[in-house]
Amino acid sequence: MKNPSFDWERLKDVFYRSRAIGELKWPTQYEEFKCALSLTVIAVEIQDFIQVYNYFGQLLGKINLQRIHEDIIKFEFDKDEKLILVTKSSIKIVKGWSPLTIESVPLQDPTIDTIWDYHNGIMLLAKSRDIYKLNGNEWELLYENKDKKYNLLTKNHWSCNDDSIILLDVDHVYQVSTSNGALLKLITDSSWHKVTISSRGFICLYNMKDNKLQIFRDPARILMEHNLDSTPDDICWCGNDTVACSFEDEIKLYGPDGLYVTFWYPFTVTNLRAEVDGLKVITTEKIYFLSRVQPQTSNIFRIGSTEPGAMLVDSFSLLEDHAPKAIEILKNFVLEKGVLDCIAAAIDEFEPKLQKMLLNAASYGKASLQYKSFDASIFVNACNTIKLLNCFRSFGIFLTVEEYRCISLKGVIDRLLKYHRYYECIQICKLANERFLLGYVFTEWAKDKIKGSPDMEDDELLDKIKSRLSVIDMTDTLQMVAVAKVAYLEGRFQLSRNLALLEKNEEARIEQLYNLDDDSIALKECIKVQNYSLTISLLIALSKKLTNSQLTKLLIIDMFNNPLYLYYMRMDKAYLYDFYRQTDRFIDLAHVLLQQGKEQQSLHSFLPQIKDLYSQVQNSEVVNNTIEQLQRQEKLWIYQESLGKRFAISFTNMTLDQTLSKLIETGQDKQVKEIVKKFKISEKKLYHLKCKTLVEAKKFDELLQFAQSRKSPIGYMPFYTYLKSRGHMDKASPYVNMIPGLSYQEKKKLYVECRGFRDAIQLAGKEKDIPGLKEIYNIIPPNEPELKALANETMSRI
C-alpha cells in the first residue's frame, strides 16, 4: 500500500495534502459559465439555466432563468445550502426544487437604490453603499453610509463573516459589526485592493500594486506578510489559519517567515471555497480537497516516524509473519496513545483501505491493553462515524469529520431532503440507528408526496402513506400532524382529518382536529384516550368558538352520560341553568335553583319554581318524597316568619332542628310543644336536641331538672356523653347513677372518666372493693389530697 505521505507538502512544521473528491460531469463545451459551491453541492450557470449537481456530477435540480424575469447578478448558497439568486431589486431564496419554490425578499424601494452585492446574508446598495442584513424575510439596516464614510470601488473591496464586515475604502480599512452596525476604523491611510476574512476573524488584505499579502486579527499585531511573485487569480482561506492563492493551475499556501508550499493541478483552477478545516479547489475537470494533515496522521505515516501510532502500525504489519517481533515492538511505546492516534487517523482518511488498516491496528493494540483500561466506546464511535462518512461519500456528499460535526447528522439529512433523495436518507438513518430521524424523513416524504400529487384522490394518497408507514413501522417518531397541516393547506380536508387521526401525540392530534373544525371527532378522541385535562381544555376552547346551543348539542351527542364538563362548570349557575333547561333535565335544574337560593339566602323565593320543576317528573317515588320535603320546608318558612314577628328574633335560613334548638335555648316551652306537634318531631329527637342545646347553653340545672322530670325515652347515657364531650366533667357525674342496667365496674369506669372520684370512692367502698379503691387512689391527681385521704379512710374501714 502506498504511503500517503508521498503526496504531502510541508509548510514549516505542518503537512498539507490535496485529495481528489469528485469529477465534474456537467456540460463543459461552454467557455462562459459561473458556478457557486456549497459544502455538498455545486450550482452552475450555463446559458439560460442554473443547474445544481452533487460532487459525483449527478443533476439534482435546475432553474430556467427566463422564468425569473430579472437579470441574475450573482448566486450563492447560504449556510443551510438554500440557493440565493441576487437581482438588482431583490434576492430570491430557493425553498424547494420539486416543485420549484422561490421566495423573494425585495428592497423596500428599488427605484431609489439597487442591490450592488450580496454575501452571507449581507447586502450592499449600489449608489449609497448602505449595508443591510437579512433578518428572516426582511432587510435590517446595519449601517447607513449617509456621510460617505467609505467608498468601495470593486466587489473585492469587502468581505464578511458572521460577526464582522471588512470594508476597503480608498484610503482606510473599516470594520462593521453585524450585531449592532457599529463602524470602526481599523487601519488609516492604507490602500488595499482585496480582502477576505476567515470564520474566526482572521483578515487577509492584498495590495495589487505592491503584490503583497498582509494577515492579522488585530491590526496592531501583523501575523504574516508576503510579497507575491505574480498576481493571484483568487485568494481564499484554507481552514482558519492559512491563506491560499490560486495561479492558473496551481495553489500556493502561505505560512510564516515568508514560507509557502505549492500544489500543482493538471487542469486550470476555476473556483475556491473555504471550509472549516480546509479548502475546496475546483478545476475544469475535478474537485479537490486541500487540507492540513492531522498530527496523528502525520505521526503515523511520516517517513522514519517513531511515534506510538507509527510503532503500532509497524507492529501490526509484522504480526502475521513475525509475531514475536511484533509483540516485542509493543513494549517500546505508550500503547494507549498509539491506539488513539490510529483511531483519529482512520477518521481523517478518505480511502477505505487506509481506514481499515488503521482500525485493524487500533483493534490489535486495544486487545493488547489491560482489561478495561481503555474505553472501548471510543473505538466503537469512531467505527460508526467512519461508516457514516463513507456512506455520505457513496451518495456524493464528501465531508470530513470536522465538517460533519458542524452540520450534524440532521443537517446531512436536510440537505438530501432538499432534492428528494429519500432512499439515501433512509439508508443513512438505518445505518446510524436513528429512529427519530427516520420518522422525520418519512414525514418530509409524506408532505412532499401530497404537494406533488395534485391528480391523486385523497383515499389513494392515504393508502399510499399508510402502506409506506407499515413498512418502516416508525409511528412513535412520526409527526403526522405536520403532514395533516400540509394536506389542509393543499385543500385536502378529508385527508388532513384522516392523517391527524394517525398522530400518536394526543395533544397534537386533538389540536389539529380542532383546527379542522372537526369538533365532534376531537371530543370523541379526548374521551377515547381518557385524558380529562385535555378534554376540559378542548371544551373550554370550544366554548369560546361555539354558541351555547352548539356546545350543548355537542355535549348531548358526544358526552350524554359524561358529567365532566358540567362538574367543571358547577360554579357557573347561569350556564348550568341554560344547559339543563335546553336538555329538559328538570331535577338538575331544580337543584341549580335550590343552590342559587341558598347562596342568595332567599330560598323561599325560588321554592315555587323548584316545586313546579319537580312536578314535571311523573311516577317517581323519589320525586314525590322530595316534593313532600319541599312542602314541609315551605311550611317551616311560614312558621319561622310568624316566630320572627312574635319574638323579634330572626329564624331565617334555619333548619327545623336549628329552629327548635333556638326556641329551647330562649325558654319558649309553649312554642317548643307547638313546633313538635306541627312538624311531628319524635320524642326521642326532641330529647336529643334539648339535651344538646341545654349543654351548649350551659344550663346545667335546667338540664338536670329536665332529666328528672320524667323517664327519658333516650335513656341517660346521652346526657352523660354530651356533657363529657363538651368538657363539663363535673356536671356529668350525677347522671351515672341514673343510667339503668350498669354493672359496678361500668359505673366505676364512667365515674373515673368524668373525674367523679368522690362518687367512685363511695361506690367502691359500698362494694368493699379494695383493689378498685387502690386503682382509684392511683388515678387521683396529687393536688387532690382530700380525695386521696378519703380513699385511704374508706379502705381502712373495710
Swiss-Prot record:
GO MF entries: actin binding
One GO BP annotation of this record: protein targeting to vacuole
Stretches that traverse the bilayer: none
Keywords from the UniProt entry: Cytoplasm, Protein transport, Transport, Vacuole
SUPFAM superfamilies tied to this protein: 3-carboxy-cis,cis-mucoante lactonizing enzyme
One Pfam family hit: Vps16_C
InterPro entries noted in UniProt: VPS16, Vps16_C, Vps16_C_sf, Vps16_N
Annotated Gene Ontology cellular component terms: CORVET complex; cytosol; early endosome membrane; endosome; fungal-type vacuole membrane; HOPS complex
Subcellular location, principal: cytoplasm
Subcellular location: Cytoplasm; Vacuole
Record flagged with keyword Transport: yes
Keyword Cytoplasm: yes
Summary of the function given for this chain in its UniProt record: Essential for vacuolar protein sorting. Required for vacuole biogenesis, stability and to maintain vacuole morphology. Required for growth at elevated temperatures. Acts as a component of the HOPS complex that acts during the docking stage of vacuole fusion. HOPS is an effector for the vacuolar Rab GTPase YPT7 and is required for vacuolar SNARE complex assembly. It remains bound to SNARE complexes after vacuole fusion.
Anything else known: Present with 1300 molecules/cell in log phase SD medium.
Subunit structure: Component of the HOPS complex which is composed of PEP5, VPS16, PEP3, VPS33, VPS39 and VPS41. HOPS associates with phosphoinositides and the PX domain of VAM7. Interacts with VAM7.
Family, similarity comment: Belongs to the VPS16 family.
Protein name per Swiss-Prot or TrEMBL: Vacuolar protein sorting-associated protein 16
Organism: Saccharomyces cerevisiae (strain ATCC 204508 / S288c)
